[in-house]
């Protein structure tokens, strides 16, 4: 399970009863994309012709800028997760990090959970 049963209100948008503002949500997505980008080369060295994780990072940033919908970012997240499935080790986790970054548009707590797992 990625998310806890009781969600921290700091990672729930105001529209859903939490305290996370839209600007904070966008900032969280940008931070998640930046974190994922730092390790993306670990995936790309294993699968250099697979663009899905890098595309997910780009989509996370595009969502934060208001250029795409949440659904588009979430779709990119799913594709990045798919890229991770047949890998192991650092390459797999780098693809997952990219997917989680794009998933922040859907649920802000995704990146918080992934960051906690990495450290």
What are these regions (language model features)?
Residues 1-119:
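Structured binding/interaction patches within domain cores
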């Amino acid at each position: 399970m990625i998310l806890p049963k009781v969600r921290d209100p700091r990672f729930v948008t105001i529209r859903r009863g939490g305290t996370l503002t839209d600007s904070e949500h966008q900032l969280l997505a940008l931070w998640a994309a930046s974190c994922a980008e730092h390790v993306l080369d670990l995936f790309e060295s294993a699968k250099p012709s697979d663009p899905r994780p890098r595309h997910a990072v780009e989509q996370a940033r595009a969502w934060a800028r208001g250029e795409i919908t949440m659904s588009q970012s979430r779709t990119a997240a799913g594709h990045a997760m798919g890229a991770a499935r047949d890998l192991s080790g650092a390459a797999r986790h780098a693809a997952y990090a990219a997917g989680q970054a794009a998933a922040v548009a859907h649920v802000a707590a995704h990146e918080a959970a992934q960051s906690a797992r990495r450290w």
